[in-house]
UniProtKB/Swiss-Prot annotation:
CDD domains: GluRS_core (cd00808). It comes from the Bacteria. It is found in: Cytoplasm. This is Glutamate--tRNA ligase. Its EC number is 6.1.1.17. The keyword Cytoplasm applies. Monomer. It comes from Mycoplasmopsis agalactiae (strain NCTC 10123 / CIP 59.7 / PG2) (Mycoplasma agalactiae).
Amino acid sequence: MNKVRTRYAPSPTGYLHIGGARTALFCYLFAKHYNGTFVFRLEDTDVKRNVADGERSQLENLKWLGIIPDESPLNPNEKYGKYRQSEKLERYRQIANELVQKGLAYKSYDTSEELEMQHSEAEKNGIASFRYDKNWLKISEEEKQKRDKAGEYSIRFSMPKDVVYEWDDIVRGKISFDSNDIGDWVIQKSDGYPTYNFAVVVDDFDMEITHVLRGEEHITNTPRQLSIYNALGWKAPEFGHLTVITNMEGKKLSKRDTSLKQFIEDYKNDGYDPHAIFNFLSLLGWTSADNSEVMTHDEIIAKFEPSRLSKSPSKFDIKKMQWFSKQYIKNMDNESIINKLNLNNDEWTNLFVDTFKQSVFALKQLLVEKENYDKPSETAPSLTQADLEVVLSFKNEFQNKDFTISQIQEAIDQVAFKTGKKGKNLFMPIRLATTYIEHGPELAKSIYLFGKDIILKRLSQWN
């Protein structure tokens, strides 16, 4: 295999989405598995839809995930030209004009109103699938020259007849399209900007991209792109089209669905572990040969085989992602967590983090738990008679103990022995009476973290 070069080429029209992150990750894994180069470039020609912060969000969140481009607008290789489409408009115009000069493309002088009329006529004639007819427009040579001089034209590629565009898709196998089903299409708009299907070919050729992994919505774009490669005598990259990501009900993820956070920045701000998301996303449409789940960055790269990319839609299971994050957070060292949360690195905080990191999937949850200790509740819970008996037994044992974690645990064990209670029937009454919280991590530590004075005060009210 020649030197592998893959690319992730988003538009800065929004922030890094789950789907975009998954695509970027698979492109990255493909390149790294074959010791190749992963390129980030920007398709920023849709000026009206561009978000000012879009490029920064994409690059910063990719970096946070551990998906580091070898080349980007911030780290370009001059050999391959510009990494933002807006900076290479002259290059696209040069290639478009070359196609015109070769008779493979032509200037189209239709106004938007005239195109609409052509659409309407086609519908009236019962033509369901509209194809542009370059002979439809009847204007004088004088009018044509006038529009030409004013730059009032687009450039259309002349689709060849009776050609089958076929490729061996990395994910799906053989796919083919008949050129007769595709009309002449615009490669350069009347404002001088290239269309996506044209610019992406020029970019991939200029950057010597060898493999393209992208969403399945691009399958129908591929024959148009192949037609440009053929016309210019350029070698096309290999294509692979990833399946969609759905919610748990099987519906394609929609950015309008507010029931699920869909941007990487949201999970970053909540304090999810970045490698947990890297790990989770890698399994969203791919499985390792040994069916491993929790894997290191390098293990995923080593095990990534494109032949194991799924042909079926992948369900985004937020609970599974939370499980992954939980595995990584509980194995983080306390100091790293304390620094990330900007907390004081003292003995109490270390014990708090060590206790509660076992049961959270996002670091922000630790701050919520810490509120219970920073601002202890004054409202005591209500207890059943059975619960009260357990609490009074604990109160009696506790009064004769030193205030240490081991002694608190010994008091709990003695209550279990004397009352015969165990599990929920033992722990929940004691937890409610001492911490005022129904659920939590290791009970003895949870009690100890409140301090002796608060615990004695709370126990004193139970008689």
